[in-house]
Amino acid sequence: MSLKPMCVAPEDSACKCCGSTSRLCGVVDFSRCGADHAAGKKVEPYSGVPIYYYRCEQCGFVFTRAFDNWEPEDFARHIYNKDYERHDPDYKGKRPSSNAEMIANSFPEMAQGRMLDFGSGLGLLECELRARGFLEVESYDPYATHTNTSVLSEKYKTVVAFEVFEHHPEPHALMDMMVRFLEEDGAIFFSTLLVTERVLEAGIDKWWYCAPRNGHISFFTSGALATIAHRHGLKAGSFNEGVHFFYRDALPGWATRYSHELWS
């Protein structure tokens, strides 16, 4: 008997970053979430929906095709719903506060220009930054029900995006949205945890960050970041495996005071 009728995912796919051949590298149940990781065991019921991930042979980008046909309403219904905070308990309190503290302490120069928190969710980071003297910061989330659409015609010196890149199914579509907000000498400051060879050798299903119920569906390498940056007229750099930046020509002043690696 042929296994073909049972196949639910092709063995290879074109990379969403560079277009190169990508091979299957792992699978997890859709229900895999932060609550499971926090408990150290499976606490969410299995959904029976397998999420297959591919890894690009060229740039190393890891992605899934499972959500390619989803509309924003689908993400709102199945991921960013009333149960989301249970899967990501830092979402409403700890993370916005710690991110604002990090920016205020390490990159105070950002307060000298207009800032946009892209993918802002409830807008809590804006509140935390304003409380720390960042008075020209605004929020925008393309998937939020009540979002500030007045920013769509504005430009900003710095666009910040914490925990955004791993949530979007199409990296180039995400970049299209973000680049439109940049001033000519503006920069994007963002966080996402890079996927490493060690993670892939151990199995992506063992990696705590691979949690589709949390919306974690796209995972980058430095090569993948350089690829999407180049295609949008930007250069890429990283401070560490979790904090990165895109810029056009001149390195932003706030980046020069810290050790970093440039990928472009």
Model regions and ranges:
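Helix-to-beta-strand junctions that scaffold the AdoMet/dcAdoMet cofactor pocket
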Residues: 168-169, 182-184
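Short "lid" loop at the C-terminus of a central beta-strand within the Rossmann-like core
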Residues: 193-198
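A short His-aromatic
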Residues: 163, 167
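Conserved N-terminal segment of class I S-adenosyl-L-methionine
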Residues: 1-158, 162, 172-177, 181, ...
